């Protein structure tokens, strides 16, 4: 009997610790490597999308992408959740300054350590282009596009 109680308790602890990881994300968000992600189909310009992400979850911002594995996760999330026929999806990176130099920080303040550019910088905001396997492209910041938030 004591052994059954111990096994039951052990299974409960494992279940609660595993479910706690997913419970850290708001309802409807996906979890990857300790962060929460959610694509939004309602198109917004870059600034409005960033503000919206700030309001959605504690620590929320437009998505920062820090590795090729995270890029693959975000690409799959977009492919499964953003309407077909949409060309661009906002990410949390934009050109800062007069010289059109890319900011060295994402909108969440993290450093840019991974890059997936398809073209040289010419406009001020960046997004994923669905037709190029989610490579990063320059987009006019006032354009309205769906976006992905990360918290």
Swiss-Prot record:
It comes from the Eukaryota. InterPro entries: C-type_lectin-like, C-type_lectin-like/link_sf, C-type_lectin/snaclec_domain, C-type_lectin_CS, CTDL_fold. It holds the Pfam family Lectin_C. GO terms for cellular component: extracellular region. Gene3D superfamilies: Mannose-Binding Protein A, subunit A. Belongs to the snaclec family. This is Snaclec 3. The lineage of its organism: Eukaryota, Metazoa, Chordata, Craniata, Vertebrata.
